[in-house]
UniProtKB/Swiss-Prot annotation:
Record's keyword terms, sorted: Ribonucleoprotein, Ribosomal protein
Organism: Synechococcus sp. (strain JA-3-3Ab)
Quaternary structure annotation from Swiss-Prot or TrEMBL: Part of the 30S ribosomal subunit.
The protein's name in its UniProt record: Small ribosomal subunit protein uS10
GO molecular function, one term: tRNA binding
Length: 105
């Protein structure tokens, strides 16, 4: 029995600012639609929350602490049946510096 393997591109995006992440996702989906590919997403993944506990005083008073947190927002976009035009358009796409992108073929 022959299985139909469909080619897809999986794009994982990470950012500290969710607004930058959403605008980047919109640009990628719009580019994929213009080149007649089929985008699925953006699919939101769980936000990672990293807490840092720091002493306020430089030498004493261990009871006084300050907490900082960093939130990492993540999204996945799948692009099915991409053409060479789709890949070229995605390579030329200008995205903000605060967004980390991983592409898997």
């Amino acid at each position: 029995m022959a299985t139909l393997t469909q080619q897809k591109i999986r794009i994982r995006l990470k950012a500290y600012d969710h607004r930058l992440l959403d605008t980047s996702c919109d640009k990628i989906v719009d580019t994929a639609r213009r080149t007649e590919a089929v985008p699925v997403g953006p699919i939101p993944l769980p936000t990672r929350r990293r807490l840092y506990c720091v002493l306020r005083s430089p030498h004493t008073d261990k009871d006084s602490r300050e907490h900082f947190e960093v939130r990492t927002h993540r999204r996945i976009i799948d692009i099915y049946s991409p053409s060479s035009k789709t890949i070229d358009a995605l390579m030329k796409l200008d995205l903000p510096a605060g967004v980390d992108i991983e592409v898997k073929l």
